[in-house]
Regions:
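N-terminal Rossmann-like NAD(P) cofactor-binding subdomain of oxidoreductases
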Residues: 1-139
Length: 140
């Protein structure tokens, strides 16, 4: 499995890397993307260094299976088609798609099955306050 992280140099991108390593997420390949300001930076993941590539409208996502995206709503909207056009599943952490009927809002503890219903190839999450609330309310 090939995994991409968009917004890799930001706080959430770094947290994605930490959690993927901590959980020993099964992947064969990792690719990091960022802005012009971040491109060229190097980050270590499981003992290997990875260089951040410039996010562009091209075919860099052709063989990507999952893209974790946390680069802001504008970037998510602008690059959604670029990321998903070859079949990658985009898991978006921004507010860009929270009102889009074709993008499921998924909180795994509550509605994990909705992640399978993704007509646009995108899964989004609700905002942090909503996530905490639905996790508590779900058993009721």
């Amino acid at each position: 499995m090939k995994v991409a992280i968009v917004g890799a140099s930001g706080a959430v991108g770094q947290e994605f890397l930490r959690i993927l390593a901590e959980r020993d997420f099964p992947m064969d390949e990792l690719v990091l993307f960022g802005s012009e300001r971040s491109a060229g930076r190097k980050y270590s993941f499981k003992g290997k260094d990875y260089e951040v590539r410039l996010l562009q409208h091209n075919d860099d996502f052709k063989d990507v299976d999952i893209a974790f995206v946390s680069a802001g709503g504008g970037t998510s909207k602008e690059y959604a088609d670029t990321i998903t056009k070859h079949g990658a599943v985009m898991i978006d952490n921004s507010s860009a798609f929270r009102m889009d009927d074709d993008v499921p809002l998924v909180v795994p503890e509550c509605n994990a099955e909705d992640a399978l219903k993704r007509p646009r190839g995108i899964i989004a999450n609700p905002n942090c306050t909503t996530i905490m609330m639905v996790v508590v309310l779900q058993p009721l």
